[in-house]
């Protein structure tokens, strides 16, 4: 299987770089990120047939709590289980519909503000919950 995603994509943060916030995951988060890529992101990329632009992946506690990130205290980004992304030429609503049709395992797929799509994978709980945050 050829992977179209790298760990560095899931670790990159413009806010982290600008404000010098460390974003180094522990081994468990790295393991979760690999599971997210192999079981969810890569199969979805192949199903959609277009590049997915990761806008947020893993977040350290400090990065997640930064006012410009404003992440939820229980965010799955903290454990390496989630990624936010966009796909050129597709709306988040269209992406969510494709995710639902794909049969790919996921815990949550969220259309966030009609700007980006959040997807998470948890090897023990892939309930396929779909949400819309206006």
Regions found by a protein language model. Name each.
Residues 24, 28, 62, 72:
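A glycine-rich, hydrophobic loop/mini-helix early in the fold
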Residues 9, 14, 62, 67, ...:
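Solvent-exposed, flexible loop/coil residues
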Residues 25-26, 53-59, 89-94:
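N-terminal start-of-chain detector that recognizes signal peptides
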Residues 33, 37-40, 50, 81, ...:
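Amphipathic alpha-helical interface surfaces
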Residues 1-47, 133-134:
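Extracytoplasmic cell-surface/polysaccharide-interacting catalytic and binding patches
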Residues 38-70:
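Extended, low-complexity, intrinsically disordered C-terminal regulatory tails
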Residues 73-74, 79-134:
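Catalytic cores and adjacent binding grooves of peptidoglycan-active enzymes
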């Amino acid at each position: 299987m050829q992977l179209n995603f790298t760990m560095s994509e899931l670790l990159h943060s413009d806010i982290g770089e600008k404000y010098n916030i460390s974003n180094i995951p522990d081994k468990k988060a790295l393991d979760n990120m690999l599971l997210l890529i192999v079981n969810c992101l890569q199969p979805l990329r192949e199903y959609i047939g277009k590049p997915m632009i990761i806008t947020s992946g893993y977040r350290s506690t400090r990065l997640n709590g930064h006012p410009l990130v404003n992440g939820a205290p229980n965010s799955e980004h903290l454990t390496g289980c989630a990624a936010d992304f966009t796909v050129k030429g597709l709306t988040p609503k269209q992406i969510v519909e494709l995710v639902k049709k794909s049969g790919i395992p996921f815990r949550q797929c969220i259309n966030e503000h009609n700007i980006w799509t959040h997807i998470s994978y948890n090897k023990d709980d892939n309930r396929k919950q779909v949400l819309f945050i206006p």
